[in-house]
C-alpha cells in the first residue's frame, strides 16, 4: 500500500481516475459531498473504487457531524460535537456521544467506507476552523466526551483518528485559507491542548492522528504536519504513539509554506507522516505521484473497517431507529439554541 490518499471528481470514476487508483503510491481515497447523490450511488462508487485499485485502499470521509458532514440526505443529521455537553446533563451527554459515534460509524461502514476522520480533539471554540466541532472548552469534559464517541465508533467496527495534534483550538485563522500561527509557549500547549491526546494515546484509544497545519512559532518554524519535532520527537518518542499519522490536506493554504505539492508531500513524509492527503487539486496529486520515490505505508492497513452488515440491516435495527430519532431531536435543539444566541 502506498502513502498517498487522494480524491475523485464526481459520482462515478472516469478513465484517468481508474489509472490513478492503480498507481503503486496510491493507498487511500477520501470522499466529498460532490461524490454523493444518494446512498445507492455512493455504495456503487465505493464498489468501483475497490474494483479499480490493485489492492484494498483505505476509503475515508469527513463525517464528523455539525457543519462537517459530507453525506446528508439519506443519512442521519449528526449534531455538532459541542451540542452534547452544551445542552445535556453529563450522563445524558455521554450516552448521546457514544450513540452518535456508533451511528456515524455504522452508517459509513454500511457503505464500505473504512474511516471517518474523527473525533476532533481540539479544545475550545475560538478557532474559525474548529468552533462547534470541539467537544468542549474544558479539557477534562472534552476528554470524557471523546472517550464516549470513540467507544461508539469502535463498537461499530471503525478505527479512530484524533485531530488536530497538538491542538488547533487556540488560533482564530482557518488553515484551509491561510497558515495559522499559534504564538503560545510549548509549555502552554502541553498544559492545555496536548493532555487529551496524551491520555487517549495512553488508553490506546487512538488508531490514527492527524496533525494541524498550524505553525507553533515558539516551537518550530514549520507547520506541525511537517515538523519532525512534533511528529517524531513528541508524538512518537515522548507519547509513544504507534498508530497511523495522516497529514491534513496538502492542498490547504496552511501547507503551502512547505513548497510545491511534491515538496509538501516529501516534507510531510520526512517529518513522520505515514499517509499524506492531496485533495481538490488533480494536478497537485499527479505531481506527488510522479515525484515521490517508491515506498510502502504498511501501518495504514490497520485502519480497514471490521463491520459486516448492509445498510438495510442497519436501518431495520431498533438501535439505529432509536438513535437516529434521539440525534435528530438533539440536532433540532442545537439549531434552536444557536438561533436564540444569534449564531
From Swiss-Prot:
It is found in: Cytoplasm. Residues 161-187 are annotated as: Disordered. Residues 174-187 have a biased composition (Basic and acidic residues). Pathway: Cell wall biogenesis; peptidoglycan recycling. Its main location: cytoplasm. Coiled coil: none annotated. GO terms for biological process: carbohydrate metabolic process; cell division; cell wall organization; peptidoglycan biosynthetic process; peptidoglycan turnover; regulation of cell shape. One of its GO terms (cellular component) is cytoplasm. Substrate binds at residues 62, 70, 133, 163-164. It comes from the Bacteria. Its EC number is 3.2.1.52. Keywords: Cell cycle, Cell division, Cell shape, Cell wall biogenesis/degradation, Cytoplasm, Glycosidase, Hydrolase, Peptidoglycan synthesis. The record marks 174 as: Important for catalytic activity. It catalyses: Hydrolysis of terminal non-reducing N-acetyl-D-hexosamine residues in N-acetyl-beta-D-hexosaminides. The active site is at 176 (proton donor/acceptor), 248 (nucleophile). GO terms for molecular function: beta-N-acetylhexosaminidase activity. InterPro entries: Beta_hexosaminidase_bac (IPR022956), Glyco_hydro_3_AS (IPR019800), Glyco_hydro_3_N (IPR001764), Glyco_hydro_3_N_sf (IPR036962), Glycoside_hydrolase_SF (IPR017853), NagZ_Beta-hexosaminidase (IPR050226). Plays a role in peptidoglycan recycling by cleaving the terminal beta-1,4-linked N-acetylglucosamine (GlcNAc) from peptide-linked peptidoglycan fragments, giving rise to free GlcNAc, anhydro-N-acetylmuramic acid and anhydro-N-acetylmuramic acid-linked peptides. HAMAP family: NagZ. Belongs to the glycosyl hydrolase 3 family. NagZ subfamily. NCBIfam families: PRK05337.1 (NF003740). This is Beta-hexosaminidase. The gene is nagZ.
Amino acid at each position: 500500500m502506498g502513502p498517498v490518499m487522494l480524491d475523485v471528481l464526481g459520482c462515478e470514476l472516469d478513465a484517468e481516475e481508474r489509472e490513478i487508483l492503480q498507481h503503486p503510491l496510491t493507498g487511500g481515497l477520501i470522499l466529498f459531498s460532490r461524490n454523493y447523490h444518494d446512498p445507492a450511488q455512493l455504495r456503487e462508487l465505493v464498489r468501483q473504487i475497490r474494483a479499480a485499485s490493485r489492492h484494498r485502499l483505505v476509503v475515508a470521509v469527513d463525517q464528523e457531524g455539525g457543519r462537517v458532514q459530507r453525506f446528508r440526505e439519506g443519512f442521519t443529521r449528526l449534531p455538532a460535537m459541542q451540542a452534547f455537553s452544551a445542552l445535556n446533563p453529563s450522563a445524558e451527554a455521554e450516552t448521546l456521544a457514544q450513540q452518535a459515534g456508533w451511528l456515524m460509524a455504522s452508517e459509513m461502514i454500511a457503505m464500505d467506507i473504512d474511516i471517518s476522520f474523527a473525533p476532533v480533539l481540539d479544545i475550545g471554540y475560538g478557532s474559525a476552523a474548529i468552533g462547534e466541532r470541539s467537544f468542549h472548552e474544558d479539557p477534562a469534559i472534552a476528554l470524557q466526551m471523546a472517550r464516549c464517541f470513540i467507544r461508539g465508533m469502535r463498537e461499530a467496527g471503525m478505527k479512530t483518528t484524533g485531530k488536530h495534534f497538538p491542538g488547533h483550538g487556540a488560533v482564530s485563522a482557518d488553515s484551509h485559507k491561510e497558515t495559522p500561527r499559534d504564538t503560545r509557549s510549548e509549555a502552554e500547549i502541553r498544559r492545555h491542548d496536548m493532555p487529551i491526546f496524551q491520555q487517549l494515546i495512553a488508553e490506546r484509544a487512538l488508531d490514527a492522528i492527524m496533525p494541524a497545519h498550524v505553525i507553533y512559532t515558539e516551537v518550530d518554524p514549520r507547520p506541525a504536519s511537517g515538523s519532525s519535532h512534533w511528529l517524531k520527537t513528541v508524538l512518537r518518542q515522548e507519547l509513544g504513539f504507534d498508530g497511523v499519522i495522516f497529514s491534513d490536506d496538502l492542498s490547504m493554504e496552511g501547507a503551502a509554506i512547505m513548497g510545491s505539492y511534491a515538496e509538501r508531500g516529501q516534507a510531510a513524509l520526512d517529518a513522520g507522516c505515514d499517509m499524506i492527503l492531496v485533495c481538490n487539486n488533480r494536478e497537485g496529486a499527479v505531481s506527488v505521484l510522479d515525484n515521490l520515490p517508491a515506498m510502502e505505508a504498511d501501518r495504514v492497513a490497520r485502519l480497514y473497517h471490521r463491520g459486516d452488515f448492509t445498510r438495510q440491516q442497519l436501518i431495520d435495527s431498533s438501535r439505529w431507529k432509536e438513535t437516529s430519532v434521539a440525534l435528530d431531536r438533539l440536532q433540532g435543539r442545537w439549531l434552536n439554541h444557536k438561533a436564540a444566541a444569534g449564531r
